[in-house]
Amino acid sequence: MATTAQYLPRGPGGGAGGTGPLMHPDAAAAAAAAAERLHAGAAYREVQKLMHHEWLGAGAGHPVGLAHPQWLPTGGGGGGDWAGGPHLEHGKAGGGGTGRADDGGGGGGFHARLVHQGAAHAGAAWAQGGTAHHLGPAMSPSPGAGGGHQPQPLGLYAQAAYPGGGGGGLAGMLAAGGGGAGPGLHHALHEDGHEAQLEPSPPPHLGAHGHAHGHAHAGGLHAAAAHLHPGAGGGGSSVGEHSDEDAPSSDDLEQFAKQFKQRRIKLGFTQADVGLALGTLYGNVFSQTTICRFEALQLSFKNMCKLKPLLNKWLEETDSSSGSPTNLDKIAAQGRKRKKRTSIEVGVKGALESHFLKCPKPSAHEITGLADSLQLEKEVVRVWFCNRRQKEKRMTPAAGAGHPPMDDVYAPGELGPGGGSASPPSAPPPPPPAALHHHHHHTLPGSVQ
């Protein structure tokens, strides 16, 4: 285990007296010599051999023979110094219960792919420069990223996990001052497009290209949403706008209603005439109340818009036929279907009144005979009797609404000269309300009854 720790890279501390999280305490002296050999450029083959043979020979499925690798997070919160670091929080969030930064499969399979596919790339990257200089910025948390939401370690692991990353992807990520990111990093950003959008600022090792890629992905999502919902944007047009353009405005409706009322009165038509004429000409019968509410702007906007073209057509029809009085009389006759009010002479009314006193509700045969004798229409006689019965019902409750007089309750001889009761009546009326509680009073002894 001490021999294995010689070839592990140090943290940003670098020296032998540092406290790097990956350094075993028993290998402090050998770490400096291992770093110098890595700088020489020949030790990466030994590291590659170590990664292929010794890391895979570890027990319990973990590399380097440790109980748990110090640089990977644990499910229960234990482990090494880096287990709770903010740079691996993204792996904890994406890994579910195990807390490992895998790509949806098992934890052991991810480690196997990381070792087999990334061994040569990692060795080449460590051979290019100082270990502490290259590994420190890549594994350190990015300034400006909030909480523990860090997608950049996932990009590092996905570079080794996905074969499409290429040989220079990881080295380009770890190189000092590298301006661009490898294709594997773009793939990881594409897989985690939502996480890339949540970042307030691009990580330092991504550069301008990775930041532009995240913006391009977010722009693609917005473009897809705009395609699915046309008209949601500021410059889009919808069907409702076209319908609003065709509909008249409230000012137009108000002006038309005023002009229509003036024209109708000038032509000599009533509101009922207009409603019936619309039914005769266009098949839509409107009541006098509807025409009145239209002129007073009391209808809903939708109904006003529906009625306006019909009234406009009626005005045009009336104007076109204004030269010929026959057409005007025809339209007026069509509108005025209600009969005139019948005026009954005084003698005829007296005969009907005398017959009403004898029989308030005559039969159809009696109505026919009475109409023939008085030279009236049968319908006129029937309506008169109906109106007379209604008048009688209105008059009857008004006369009997008051209380009956006292003479109807008490006989004249029952009242004494002083106003008191001389003798109890044979059939006394029900007691007044004041006498209802009389039975509660007891007669005192010795009192005169």
UniProtKB/Swiss-Prot annotation:
Protein's UniProt name: POU domain, class 3, transcription factor 1
Segments forming domain POU-specific: 245-319
Q: Which UniProt keywords apply?
A: Activator, DNA-binding, Homeobox, Nucleus, Repressor, Transcription, Transcription regulation
Task: Fetch the Pfam families from UniProt.
Answer: Homeodomain, Pou
Spell out the SUPFAM superfamilies in the cross-references: Homeodomain-like (SSF46689), lambda repressor-like DNA-binding domains (SSF47413)
| Biological function | Transcription factor that binds to the octamer motif (5'-ATTTGCAT-3'). Acts as a transcriptional activator when binding cooperatively with SOX4, SOX11, or SOX12 to gene promoters. Acts as a transcriptional repressor of myelin-specific genes.
Location of region: Disordered = 1-22, 76-108, 132-152, 184-251, 393-449
Q: Where is the composition biased (Basic and acidic residues)?
A: 188-197
Q: Gene3D superfamilies this protein is in? A: Homeodomain-like (1.10.10.60), lambda repressor-like DNA-binding domains (1.10.260.40)
Which biological process, per GO, is one annotated for this protein?
positive regulation of DNA-templated transcription
Low complexity bias: where?
A: 132-143, 218-230
What would be an example GO MF term here?
A: DNA binding
Which stretches does UniProt call biased (Gly residues)?
Answer: 11-20, 93-108
Composition skew (Pro residues), residue ranges: 425-434
Where's DNA bound on this chain? 337-396
The family assignment reads:
Belongs to the POU transcription factor family. Class-3 subfamily.
List the InterPro entries hit by this protein, alphabetically: HD, Homeobox_CS, Homeodomain-like_sf, Lambda_DNA-bd_dom_sf, POU, POU_dom, POU_domain_TF, TF_POU_3
GO CC term (a single one): nucleoplasm
Write out the annotated subcellular location.
Nucleus
Top-level taxon: Eukaryota
